[in-house]
Amino acid sequence: MKVSAALLCLLLMAATFSPQGLAQPDSVSIPITCCFNVINRKIPIQRLESYTRITNIQCPKEAVIFKTKRGKEVCADPKERWVRDSMKHLDQIFQNLKP
């Protein structure tokens, strides 16, 4: 009986101090959103609700994700004139909404 209790105690200690038991993530894992393809046609400004810039170095392309009023997300090239104009327009709308 003493042997099995000692063995159980030893196994619990080994499990507690094993490298997997002590492993801690270096940072919180945050999902990364990347755009691999961009739309090649203009989206009318009145259909757009918001945008997010994608500048993560882990993504293959710099991009802008537009969210439409219907909830669809579309990737666009920030170098395109219509994309920059749309971003500026949305910025002005949000600026006017602030008190």
From Swiss-Prot:
| Reported tissue expression | Highest expression found in the small intestine and peripheral blood cells. Intermediate levels seen in the heart, placenta, lung, skeletal muscle, thymus, colon, ovary, spinal cord and pancreas. Low levels seen in the brain, liver, spleen and prostate.
Q: Check the record and name the InterPro entries matching this protein.
A: Chemokine_b/g/d, Chemokine_CC_CS, Chemokine_IL8-like_dom, Interleukin_8-like_sf
Q: Which compartment or compartments is the protein found in? A: Secreted
Q: Which residues form the signal peptide?
A: 1-23
* GO CC annotation, single: extracellular space
Modifications made to the protein after synthesis = N-terminal processed form MCP-2(6-76) is produced by proteolytic cleavage after secretion from peripheral blood monocytes.
* Example of a GO biological process term: positive regulation of leukocyte migration
Q: List the cysteine pairs that form cystine.
A: C34-C59, C35-C75
Alphabetically sorted, this entry's keywords are:
Chemotaxis, Cytokine, Disulfide bond, Heparin-binding, Inflammatory response, Pyrrolidone carboxylic acid, Secreted, Signal
GO molecular function (one): phospholipase activator activity
> Pyrrolidone carboxylic acid: which positions carry it?
Q24
Main localisation: secreted
Up-regulation conditions = By IFNG/IFN-gamma, mitogens and IL1/interleukin-1.
Role, per record: Chemotactic factor that attracts monocytes, lymphocytes, basophils and eosinophils. May play a role in neoplasia and inflammatory host responses. This protein can bind heparin. The processed form MCP-2(6-76) does not show monocyte chemotactic activity, but inhibits the chemotactic effect most predominantly of CCL7, and also of CCL2 and CCL5 and CCL8.
Query: What subunit structure does UniProt give?
Result: Monomer or homodimer; in equilibrium.
This chain's protein is named C-C motif chemokine 8
* Species of provenance: Homo sapiens (Human)
What is the gene called?
Answer: CCL8
